[in-house]
Every structure is written in structure tokens, then in C-alpha cells.
């Protein structure tokens, strides 16, 4: 491996990270680790909070993960800088009905004082294609971005696909400045669920996130809520870099609801 790649791994995860210890430093792990996030990371993120001044000028990004199968849920998540806001879960809706519900929720958010979103990232595979098209017809065409989890990452040398890249960014955010809802049991469990590995891609070693299908094969449910939050990291331009969070109880307004 190159010195540049090794240093980037140390910079991202620190020398105490078990994966770095084994694969970069050649040391024994302190504990088995093939997960991006652990329960401790989630707990700390749930305990953080941020004053309004820390996020009010940050980009408002919504992520919509669209259900693929009957047992899956469609989930809408909003993030603004270090804050992950309330989430909405939908079941048994076709693309048009889902788009209508999403549009109403965002409009209601704006009526409550929020700015128009800077981006609405929508899973446009399968049923998602219908929701994506209808959201454009409903007037969100200037902010909507279609996402295919299998598309090429911005940094294709380091990440196997876009989903892996978004989860990597989300994990860094969670470990550093991210403020998760204090009652996010479902989201927290999903954030800790997928495994990862590193695989050779030509001359480079790429980060590979466990697929939803592989998770289901080992009896783990689809991380729909976590995927929705990950989609708010579609672009690294929306990641807050300079904010140092205060440790406090999670804000009551950042809760998960079913819609």
C-alpha cells in the first residue's frame, strides 16, 4: 500500500482504530472490528447537541430511501450540518403516493420556518424512479438529485460504489460532530449493522460496504433509515468541517416518527 493511502486511513480513523491497527500498522486488534460504527459511537452522537448558530446557515439536505420489497420501509431524513432531524417512515405506498407525502412534509417544514431545501436526494432505483419523476412534477426539480447506490463514487479509487462512500462520510460525521435524535433506537441499530471489507480494485484498495442483500442473507434487516441519512452525504460539500459540538441531551425536536 502507498504511504499516502496509509496516512489517509490514519487521518480518517485514528491509530487506535482496530482496522488501522491490523491493515496499516501491522498490529493485533484490541477487539474484532468489521463495522463502521459501534454502539458507543451512536450513544455519543445521541448525547451531542448543537446551538442553532452552529447549523442555521448549513445546507438543508433531505434523503429519501425508497422501499424495494414489501418488508422494507421508505424513509425520509433531513440533515442540516451537524443535526439529524426527525425521520418519517412510509409503508405500502407506490411511487406517486410516496412523492405526494414527501412533498407535503417538506412544504410543512418550510411553513414552520425552514428554508427551501438545498438538495433532495432520492433513491431512483425500482419504485424510486416513479417517486423521483413525480417529485420533479411537484416542483422540486431544481433541488432533486437521483441516487443509485451502485453508481461510481466521487473517489472511485477509495470506494467500491456510491453507497460505500456515503456511509463512510456518514460514519465520520457520526464519530465527530453528528447529533443524532436521542430516541433513535432503530436508526442507531441500523448504523451499527452492516459490515465492511477492503478489496483490491486494480492498483487500488477500495472500501466495500456490505450490501442489503448480503445483510438479509445473514438475517439482518434492511437499514432503510440509515440509508436515508447516508443519502444526505451524497456530496461532501454538505459536510460540516469546522464545528466542535457541545455535549448535551438530544433536542426533543429531533425525533423519529411514522408518517
Where are these regions (language model features)?
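Charge-patterned, long linear interaction tracts outside catalytic cores
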Residues: 63, 185-247
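ATPase catalytic-site recognition across NTP-hydrolyzing enzymes
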Residues: 1-64, 78, 200-204
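Short beta-strand scaffold segments in enzyme catalytic cores
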Residues: 74-78, 229
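Short, flexible loop/turn elements at secondary-structure junctions
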Residues: 28, 68, 124-126
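A residue-level signal for conserved active-site and pocket-lining positions in enzyme catalytic cores
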Residues: 24, 170, 228
Amino acid at each position: 500500500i502507498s504511504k499516502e493511502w496509509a496516512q489517509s486511513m490514519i487521518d480518517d480513523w485514528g491509530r487506535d482504530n482496530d482496522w488501522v491497527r491490523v491493515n496499516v500498522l501491522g498490529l493485533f486488534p484490541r477487539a474484532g472490528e468489521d463495522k463502521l460504527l459501534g454502539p458507543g459511537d451512536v450513544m455519543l452522537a445521541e448525547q451531542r447537541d448543537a446551538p442553532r448558530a452552529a447549523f442555521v446557515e448549513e445546507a438543508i439536505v433531505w434523503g429519501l430511501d425508497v422501499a424495494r420489497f414489501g418488508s422494507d420501509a421508505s424513509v425520509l431524513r433531513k440533515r442540516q450540518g451537524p443535526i439529524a432531524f426527525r425521520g418519517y417512515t412510509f409503508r405500502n405506498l407506490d411511487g406517486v403516493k410516496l412523492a405526494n407525502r414527501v412533498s407535503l412534509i417538506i412544504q410543512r417544514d418550510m411553513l414552520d420556518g425552514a428554508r427551501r431545501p438545498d438538495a433532495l436526494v432520492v433513491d431512483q432505483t425500482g419504485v424510486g424512479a416513479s417517486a423521483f419523476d413525480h417529485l420533479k412534477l411537484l416542483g422540486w426539480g431544481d433541488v432533486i438529485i437521483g441516487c443509485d447506490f451502485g453508481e461510481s463514487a466521487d473517489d472511485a479509487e477509495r470506494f467500491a460504489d456510491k453507497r460505500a462512500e456515503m456511509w463512510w462520510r456518514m460514519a465520520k460525521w457520526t464519530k465527530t460532530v453528528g447529533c443524532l435524535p436521542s430516541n433513535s433506537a432503530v436508526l442507531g441499530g441500523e448504523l451499527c449493522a452492516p459490515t465492511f471489507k477492503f478489496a483490491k480494485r486494480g492498483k487500488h484498495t477500495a472500501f466495500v460496504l456490505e450490501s442489503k442483500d448480503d445483510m438479509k442473507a445473514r438475517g439482518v434487516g434492511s437499514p432503510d433509515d440509515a440509508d436515508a441519512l447516508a443519502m444526505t452525504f451524497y456530496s461532501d460539500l454538505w459536510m460540516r468541517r469546522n464545528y466542535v459540538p457541545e455535549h448535551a441531551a438530544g433536542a426533543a425536536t429531533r425525533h423519529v416518527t411514522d408518517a
